Regions:
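Long, low-complexity or tandemly repetitive, helically biased scaffold regions used
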Residues: 216, 220-358
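Hydrophobic h-region of N-terminal signal peptides that target proteins for export
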Residues: 1-6
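Flexible, surface-exposed loop/linker segments and immediately adjacent secondary-structure boundaries
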Residues: 7-57, 61-249, 253-256, 287, ...
Length: 358
């Protein structure tokens, strides 16, 4: 991932886009804080997190620096991150979908820009098309195209999805083309999502038991890594420098190289965990809306733990987790500022964890 920052003096970044329409509850998190009410005309930037509540929706008009003309729709119940890697002729924009659904209609302005949409299991490449990308709380993914075509990949499966077609990936199964034509995209999306929820309800206690096992393990691993990260003197100093707008000097100075080497150890440990954990706890929060208040919440998912008790515990953990994840994302940005706008490798690269590029 690359960010447009100077090492000697912070510079204003170009926006990823501008809010063109908003309704309901929509929040933007930037530099470790949630901004005020989201309004028409607000700019959004690379590394922002955009979250829509169950009544929320936001449409973002893409900035010309992305190399794309068009808009991005973030539907209700969604959490996404915006990523951007600048290049004179082939800038790359990435929408990292944590939960929820997005849609977009884009075309290239000039050169060879790309727009990529991804979650933990599926990557979709776009150059000029109209598409939808939907995740269910169960972890299933639906990708469909209504104009042009999109390339979609997962593990060793690569598919080309033409207009009027879709593909899905269910946890534990391979990405596959759906054997149906899509005439009304929104109706198809809603039916697919409802089918996923009904399948979950049919086996909710067992599914929630698996969520609980994974949540508890990842929660413990996260805080084991987070405590030394949070107490880092280097992180505190970087945050103070950011608040004061201090000049940062050479990215290759011995002192800064030592700082970066220590911080990337913390960042790498947390990233390994959050790549899955952030999605898990946000999906559990979505499932709570489905289960709480129904008879399922009284069923045990393991001896002594009911579905309702587990879901309420996760919801009570969520505010602190949200703050701590935001601090981690802020640290990523502070690192990149001090590393010529780059993390050790682009965050979408498969070889990140093996990199020694500081």
């Amino acid at each position: 991932m690359a960010l447009a920052f100077s090492q000697s003096q912070p510079q204003a970044r170009r926006p990823f886009g501008t809010v063109d329409y908003v309704e309901g509850s929509v929040s933007i998190t930037r530099a470790n804080r949630v901004l005020g009410e989201t309004n028409f005309g607000d700019e959004v930037f690379p590394d922002d997190m955009i979250k829509t509540e169950n009544d929320g929706l936001v449409i973002i008009k893409l900035d010309r620096t992305t190399g794309m003309n068009g808009d991005l729709t973030v539907r209700s119940g969604s959490s996404i991150y915006l990523r951007f890697e600048p290049h004179a002729t082939s800038p790359r924009s990435t929408i990292e979908v944590i939960t929820g659904q997005i849609g977009s209609k884009v075309s290239r302005l000039a050169g060879s820009p790309t727009l990529q949409v991804r979650n933990e299991s599926t990557v979709m490449g776009v150059r000029g098309t109209e598409f939808g990308f939907v995740t269910a709380p169960t972890g299933s993914v639906l990708v469909y195209c209504t104009e042009g075509n999109v390339a979609c990949s997962s593990d060793d499966v690569n598919l080309n999805i033409p207009a009027g077609q879709g593909a899905e990936q269910v946890p534990g199964q391979r990405l596959r083309l759906l054997p149906v034509a899509i005439s009304n995209a929104r109706d198809f999306e809603n039916r697919w999502f409802s089918d996923q929820i009904e399948a979950f309800r049919a086996n909710a206690p067992r599914a929630l038991a698996d969520f609980a096992r994974r949540y508890e393990q990842l929660h413990s691993e996260f805080y084991t890594a987070f405590e030394p990260f949070q107490s880092s003197e280097i992180l505190a100093r970087w945050m103070q420098e950011d608040r004061s707008g201090a000049a940062l000097g050479s990215p290759n100075s011995p002192a800064l190289m030592r700082d970066k080497r220590e911080m990337i150890t913390h960042i790498a440990r947390l990233r390994r965990n959050l790549f899955i954990f952030e999605r898990i706890y946000l999906r559990i929060d979505q499932l709570a809306d489905i289960i709480l208040g129904t008879a399922i919440e009284n069923q045990e998912i393991r001896p002594g733990l009911t579905a309702g008790a587990f879901l309420r515990r996760v919801r009570s953990d969520a505010p602190a987790l949200t703050r701590h994840v935001s601090l981690y994302r802020y640290a990523e940005t502070l690192y990149a500022i001090r590393n010529e706008g780059r993390l050790p490798t682009d965050m979408s690269d498969d070889d990140f964890f093996g990199s020694s590029d500081f």
